[in-house]
């Protein structure tokens, strides 16, 4: 599924590393990037379960190596 998301591998790794740092149990990609019908400038929609959602969201927004915007929700 991530192969068709248009998200670079390094950004996926950064998100995974940050999720581990804040003890996020699950990160779910949803929206246009999950469906594969995204545009070049589409944001990255993520849902999280567990851990420190607020710090995770701030860290992802500030430290990942992409100019794309994130929309992160807590389940």
Residue ranges and their predicted role:
Residues 22, 39-43, 65-67:
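Short connector loops at helix/strand junctions that flank enzyme active sites
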Residues 24, 30-32, 56:
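Short amphipathic beta-strand starts and helix->beta connectors
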Residues 17-18, 34-37, 60-63:
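Short, flexible, glycine/charge-rich loop motifs used to bind or transfer phosphoryl groups or to couple energy/partner
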């Amino acid at each position: 599924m991530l192969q068709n998301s248009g998200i670079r591998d390094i950004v996926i790794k950064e998100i995974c590393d940050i999720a581990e740092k804040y003890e996020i149990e699950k990160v779910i990609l949803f929206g246009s990037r999950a469906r594969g019908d995204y545009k070049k400038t589409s944001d990255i929609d993520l849902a999280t379960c567990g851990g420190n959602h607020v710090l995770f969201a701030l860290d992802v927004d500030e430290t990942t190596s992409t100019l794309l915007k994130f929309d992160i929700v807590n389940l």
